[in-house]
């Protein structure tokens, strides 16, 4: 949450830098470390501003015989905590109370599909979420071999992941990985090595619009209607129009099935290094070259179909995208280590070059032949109206860095880091970022020798600056559009269309202060880490809309604060000689705040979220309910109620500016999805050589405000949840102490999603 742009961390896998680790198999991971403070992250440069995750994969050992291991699992995935919707009886009961004209669609459901109007019983009683969802299988298999000789270590392996989606249509993810690593001591003064991964994945994506349609569409129609025998129906889906429901109502199962969206990804990741040991155990120079190439082929096809006049496709449509992404990083680092007496010293000096390039070629055509995939080519569609798009960008960076570490008797530790980072993304090409850290192992002091509470204790403190260049490679031109490289959520490569508008972009800088303590007690069975952090992002890049234009112009327009506390507790113990167990608990508190925006601007996204000074990033934005009108006299005495024809049972919105008009000027922050508190627990046990572990339990608490039950039926949507049935309306039963909004269906009313307290 430290940037208005990309907030993903940097992953360092065996010394190679990655933006994501989709290619990595979990069973290949030997160790994972999260760097929390600025002094530790600073050496990794401009991509470390959002944190660093260091991963070491499993490798062979010197003089080790070949070892073959297999790891596999089979599991299921199932949606939990689903929203409970009204059944047909509840829906009809509430609709008739809200609007007697709803009788027509309810009567049509009984006439079309059977039922009884007298007691509002329906043969059609569809739970659309149940129709869309399934229990999905997932399985993973990995086979590895590792070993080593006197001068070399090696490891190689392959893994296969198959994961089905929870939507009950053809949607899945399949991934095949091959991995190899070799380290070889060619001479006493020369060590060389190689790491490589080849990954191939196929993904079929679901039509996510079906989820919203399942929320909107009432239960009084079935999924299928076998009586519909018109030839234009590939399947006999029921249309909401059959009971008089039009506009935003669709059959979500039909939407999910009439869609074909596929991605195939080929990724090659390599790293070569050579290390020269110029002075044994003191001076070495290491040069490494990493190359990452990805090719992504995407295809989205919509066939012809007809469910109703508002849910149809008269001609096929095909869009194909080919994406190529290249990245290389060349690092050269000299490290000197020395020790005299109780003093030890390590110095590092290095340089890094990097380049990233992205190319996109996209084409769209209609009236492409249906049937086998062999016919699904852009060239076979209509030439008229076909479109072609060629897009891309290139980014370059150059960095120089140094680090000095000092350690006295493993008791006092100092660390200083300085980086000069250059980036083609900024008009101000160079940024300079220092950091400093210190640690004190108190348990090494003489005055701690006679105490028996702490087995180990260390105090830590650090301060540093980190540059962040995870912004568009636009050099300050106005970006109109953010274009996904291929369809779906699994890609993280963005493209931007630039205009002639221009701004001068300077570096986005994270200023971070950390204070922490590590201690062990009870004979090292209880270990704890406590960290307090204060992260202030200066010159945060955000893209407000230009006046009189829909264009977005990036600029250094903001300042973001993140401050909080992290607590980690781990208990390690054993019972007898063969049973070892571990219990871990993590607790976190976070305060996120937009500290400043240039010109005190208010940036509203889609009318639902806002960025404004003093509030959490991307806070919910709307009208605040302060009560419900109780009597006709109260309505008559309120100018707002009189002007809008409001009645007892309607919401009273807060008139923020006191002008007796409820409009956009009265919207305010209603809460945030960002959790203030999070916690997780992980019990683990080890019996001899077999391991059994339970899944982690994660909880979080966020101030999301309270939201009105969706009980206002507008002309385009009618959404009723089971919670609505239990809590909304019933004004007639509460004539003098109304606690629930009344049910009604009238355009322009004041019952919208707000902050109505529900109890």
Language model features with spans:
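Short beta-strands and strand-coil junctions in structured, solvent-facing domains, enriched
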Residues: 3-4, 18-20, 38-43, 60-63, ...
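Residues embedded in well-ordered regular secondary structure
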Residues: 3-5, 9, 51, 59-170, ...
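Extracellular/periplasmic, surface-exposed regions of secreted and cell-surface proteins
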Residues: 8, 136-139, 181-190, 195-200, ...
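Short acidic/polar hinge/loop motifs at secondary-structure boundaries
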Residues: 9, 14-42
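Non-catalytic regulatory/gating segments with a bias toward low-complexity or hydrophobic composition
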Residues: 15, 32-33, 53-55, 567
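Conserved small-residue
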Residues: 69-119, 362, 555-558, 572-673, ...
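Extracytoplasmic gating/loop element in the C-terminal half of outer-membrane beta-barrel translocons
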Residues: 118, 253, 382, 699-759
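Conserved C-terminal beta-signal and adjacent last beta-strands/turns
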Residues: 144, 582, 672-700, 726, ...
């Amino acid at each position: 949450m430290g940037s208005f742009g990309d907030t993903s961390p940097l992953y360092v896998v065996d010394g190679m830098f990655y933006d994501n680790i989709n290619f990595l198999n979990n069973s290949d991971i030997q160790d994972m470390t999260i760097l929390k403070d600025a002094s530790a992250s600073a050496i990794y440069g401009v991509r470390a501003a959002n944190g660093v995750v260091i991963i070491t994969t499993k490798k062979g050992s010197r003089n080790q015989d070949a070892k073959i291991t297999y790891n596999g699992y089979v599991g299921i995935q199932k949606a939990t905590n689903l929203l409970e919707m009204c059944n047909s009886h509840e829906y009809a009961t509430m609709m008739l109370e809200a609007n007697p004209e709803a009788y027509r669609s309810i009567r049509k459901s009984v006439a079309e599909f059977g039922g009884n109007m007298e007691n509002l019983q329906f043969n059609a009683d569809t739970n659309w979420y149940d129709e869309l969802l399934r229990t999905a299988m997932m399985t993973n298999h990995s086979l590895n071999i590792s070993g080593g000789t006197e001068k070399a270590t090696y490891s190689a392996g392959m893994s296969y992941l198959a994961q089905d989606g929870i939507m009950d249509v053809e949607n899945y993810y399949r991934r095949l990985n091959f991995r190899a690593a070799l380290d070889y001591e060619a001479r006493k003064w020369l060590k060389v090595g190689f790491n490589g991964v080849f990954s191939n994945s196929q993904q079929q994506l679901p039509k996510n619009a079906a989820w919203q349609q399942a929320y909107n569409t009432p239960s009084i129609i079935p999924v299928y209607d076998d009586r519909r025998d018109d030839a234009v129906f590939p399947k006999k889906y029921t249309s909401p129009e059959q009971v008089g429901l039009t506009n935003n109502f669709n059959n979500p199962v039909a939407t999910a099935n009439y869609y074909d969206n596929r991605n195939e990804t080929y990724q090659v990741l390599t790293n070569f290094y050579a290390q020269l040991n110029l002075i044994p155990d003191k001076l070495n120079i290491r040069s490494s070259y990493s190359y990452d190439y990805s090719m992504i082929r995407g295809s989205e096809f919509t066939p012809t179909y007809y469910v109703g006049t508002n849910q149809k496709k008269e001609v096929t449509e095909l869009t194909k995208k080919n994406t190529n992404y290249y990245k290389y990083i060349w690092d050269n680092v000299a490290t000197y280590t020395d020790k005299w007496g109780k003093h030890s010293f390590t110095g590092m000096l290095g340089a890094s070059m990097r380049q990233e390039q992205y190319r996109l070629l996209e084409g769209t055509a209609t009236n492409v032949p249906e049937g086998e995939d062999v016919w699904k080519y852009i060239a076979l569609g209509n030439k008229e109206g076909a479109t072609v798009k060629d897009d891309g960008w290139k980014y370059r960076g150059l960095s120089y860095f140094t680090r000095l570490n000092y350690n006295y008797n493993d008791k006092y530790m100092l660390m200083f880091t300085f980086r000069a980072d250059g980036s083609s993304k900024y008009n101000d090409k160079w940024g300079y970022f220092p950091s400093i850290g210190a640690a004190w192992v108190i348990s090494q002091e003489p005055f701690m020798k006679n105490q028996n509470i702490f087995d180990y204790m260390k105090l830590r403190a650090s301060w540093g600056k980190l540059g962040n260049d995870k912004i568009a490679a636009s050099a300050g031109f106005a970006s109109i559009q953010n274009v996904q490289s291929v369809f779906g959520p699994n890609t993280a490569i963005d493209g931007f269309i630039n205009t002639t508008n221009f701004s001068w972009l300077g570096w986005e800088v994270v200023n971070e202060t950390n204070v922490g303590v590590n201690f062990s007690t009870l004979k090292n069975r209880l270990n704890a880490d406590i960290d307090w952090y204060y992260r202030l992002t200066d010159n945060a890049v955000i893209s407000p809309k230009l006046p009189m234009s829909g264009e977005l112009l990036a600029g250094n327009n903001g300042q973001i604060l993140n401050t909080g506390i992290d607590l980690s507790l781990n208990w390690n113990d054993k019972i007898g000689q063969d049973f070892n167990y571990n219990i871990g608990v993590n607790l976190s508190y976070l305060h996120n705040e937009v500290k400043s925006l240039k010109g005190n601007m208010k940036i509203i996204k889609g009318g639902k979220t806002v960025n404004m000074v003093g509030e959490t990033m991307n806070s919910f934005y709307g009208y605040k309910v302060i009560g419900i009108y109780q009597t006709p006299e109260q309505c008559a005495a309120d100018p707002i109620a009189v002007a809008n024809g409001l009645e007892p049972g309607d919401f009273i919105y807060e008139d923020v500016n006191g002008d007796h008009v409820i409009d956009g000027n009265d919207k305010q922050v209603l809460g945030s999805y960002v959790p203030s508190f999070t916690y997780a627990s992980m019990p683990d046990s080890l019996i001899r050589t077999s391991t059994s572990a339970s899944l982690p339990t994660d909880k979080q608490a966020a101030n999301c405000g309270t939201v009105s039950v969706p009980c206002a039926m507008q002309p385009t949507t009618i959404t009723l949840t089971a919670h609505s049935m239990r809590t909304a309306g019933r004004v007639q039963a509460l004539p003098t102490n109304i606690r629930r909004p009344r049910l009604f269906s009238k355009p322009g009313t004041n019952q919208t999603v707000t902050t109505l307290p529900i109890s």
